[in-house]
């Protein structure tokens, strides 16, 4: 079968006709096919099965394989390997440094790394079924004794009868009864019982707050004091977060010409005032105009 070579070109190389023609001059055009990687990636072109003895991945317009690595995914790589003959080679363009495709993908596809960036598709011949002819009698088994003869020469030992009483005695010896009263001595039995948690009489009833006795000894009073201290600390922390310092307060005098609030539109009316504006509810006024309140009526 004649050798056939496949050249895979990225789109950046095909956009430079002069450089592409210079690359094609290094190969025999009568035994070379050219295919675009972007057309394979988009599914616009397909490759024949087991048609090429060698596949060469060309470098892009920048003399690197970065564009080829982006286009050759696992699906496209398996399609390329399917068009390679058994014993064929796939590699990147000569005199170009870099990796044309992923090494792990090549190994997973069943290729063998032969060096210098070349990978070979193993030439595995098709498996053929080979019948096995087994004779009825083998020479090395001809002199072997039969089963009946071996049984006669080596008889089995006589059977031993085991009575039920013997079995019961063995079980009784294995499982001895233990007196539970002997597990604890007098000192352990007389030790006080320590209750964990509040005593039953100190437990609150449903819907009522827990209250400790005046002479509480079960630890409920101490537990309630710790809970109150935690609540008080949380309340003080929240109060400190809401407290404003002197530097946080800003006083704005609206009776002086040119003085405005933070939004700068307080004098235009409620539609232009923020939520915390002190002039909410007052009519619009001129900046610098004196505002007076007389009998809850606004006097401008």
UniProtKB/Swiss-Prot annotation:
Keywords: 2Fe-2S, 4Fe-4S, Cytoplasm, Iron, Iron-sulfur, Metal-binding, Mitochondrion. [4Fe-4S] cluster binds at residues 263, 266, 274, 277. Residues 131-190 are annotated as: Linker. One of its GO terms (molecular function) is metal ion binding. GO terms for biological process: iron-sulfur cluster assembly. It comes from the Eukaryota. Its main location: cytoplasm. Pfam families: CIAPIN1, DRE2_N. Signal peptide: none annotated. Residues 1-130 are annotated as: N-terminal SAM-like domain. One of its GO terms (cellular component) is mitochondrial intermembrane space. A motif (Cx2C motif 1) lies at residues 263-266. It is found in: Cytoplasm; Mitochondrion intermembrane space. A motif (Cx2C motif 2) lies at residues 274-277. Residues 263-277 are annotated as: Fe-S binding site B. Its cofactor is [2Fe-2S] cluster; [4Fe-4S] cluster. The C-terminal domain binds 2 Fe-S clusters but is otherwise mostly in an intrinsically disordered conformation. Belongs to the anamorsin family. Monomer. Interacts with tah18. Interacts with mia40. Component of the cytosolic iron-sulfur (Fe-S) protein assembly (CIA) machinery required for the maturation of extramitochondrial Fe-S proteins. Part of an electron transfer chain functioning in an early step of cytosolic Fe-S biogenesis, facilitating the de novo assembly of a [4Fe-4S] cluster on the scaffold complex cfd1-nbp35. Electrons are transferred to dre2 from NADPH via the FAD- and FMN-containing protein tah18. PANTHER family: ANAMORSIN (PTHR13273:SF14). This is Fe-S cluster assembly protein dre2. It comes from Aspergillus fumigatus (strain CBS 144.89 / FGSC A1163 / CEA10).
